């Protein structure tokens, strides 16, 4: 699968179902804790530097951001979870917004859950993965920041994350570095069956 980086646009930032775009395109949602690198991942996958706004400040994405990717699919950037400085009320609001999207959106075909390869999955990572499995949502786990781990230890870290998430044998886990940028095609190939 190839995408034209010049044919990508943010369609809408939504907080409720009525605002979701009316489209026939399949959707791939990206979830992960705050600062795991969701926006950086989106930018590196589509070959654009600043399409999805990155921030040093965790918890910056507060809406569901729908990106039309070359009229082939829609990436949905979901607010990051597990950010302590967001108020309890705000966390509950995010929770409801994400739940409504995940449980009601028929266009949703796949969730890419991003976890930090350097660390054990957080309790929130585990809860999110279990939540997706509870609703039978196909999930691709991408371990970000691969470049921060010595090459010889990458597989050990992947195995650890797979074990701690208690991953479904049908789900795939891949390590990724937005800096090395060498696995986009592999990931597009994993996404493609869900959107055709």
UniProtKB/Swiss-Prot annotation:
Q: Which SUPFAM superfamilies match?
A: P-loop containing nucleoside triphosphate hydrolases
An example molecular function term from Gene Ontology annotations: GTP binding
Enumerate the Pfam families for this protein: MMR_HSR1 (PF01926)
PROSITE patterns referenced in this protein's UniProt entry, alphabetically: G_ENGB
Which CDD domains does this one have?
YihA_EngB
User: Which cofactors is this protein said to need?
Assistant: Mg(2+)
Sites where the protein binds Mg(2+): 39, 61
Q: Which residues form the EngB-type G domain?
A: 24-196
The UniProt entry's GO CC annotations, sorted and at most eight, read: cytosol
Q: Which UniProt keywords apply?
A: Cell cycle, Cell division, GTP-binding, Magnesium, Metal-binding, Nucleotide-binding, Septation
Q: Where does GTP bind?
A: 32-39, 59-63, 77-80, 144-147, 176-178
Q: Name one GO biological process term.
A: division septum assembly
User: Which PANTHER family has this protein been placed in?
Assistant: ENGB-TYPE G DOMAIN-CONTAINING PROTEIN, MSS1/TRME-RELATED GTP-BINDING PROTEIN
- Name the family the entry cites: Belongs to the TRAFAC class TrmE-Era-EngA-EngB-Septin-like GTPase superfamily. EngB GTPase family.
What job does this protein perform?
A: Necessary for normal cell division and for the maintenance of normal septation.
Give the protein's recorded name. Answer: Probable GTP-binding protein EngB
């Amino acid at each position: 699968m190839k995408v034209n980086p010049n044919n990508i646009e943010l369609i809408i930032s939504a907080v409720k179902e009525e605002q979701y775009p009316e489209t026939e395109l399949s959707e791939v949602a990206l979830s992960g804790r705050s600062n795991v690198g969701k926006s950086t991942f989106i930018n590196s996958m589509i070959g654009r530097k600043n399409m999805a706004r990155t921030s040093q400040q965790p918890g910056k994405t507060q809406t569901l951001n729908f990106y039309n990717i070359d009229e082939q699919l829609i990436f949905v950037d979901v607010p990051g979870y597990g950010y302590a400085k967001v108020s309890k009320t705000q966390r509950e609001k995010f929770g409801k917004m994400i739940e409504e999207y995940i449980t009601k959106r028929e266009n949703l075909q796949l969730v890419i859950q991003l976890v930090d390869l350097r660390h054990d999955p957080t309790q929130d990572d585990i809860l999110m993965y279990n939540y997706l499995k509870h609703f039978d949502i196909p999930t691709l786990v991408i371990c970000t920041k691969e470049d921060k781990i010595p090459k010889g230890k990458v597989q050990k870290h992947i195995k650890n994350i797979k074990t701690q998430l208690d991953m479904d044998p049908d789900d795939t886990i891949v390590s990724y570095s937005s800096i090395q940028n060498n696995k986009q095609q592999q990931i597009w190939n994993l996404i493609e069956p869900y959107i055709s």
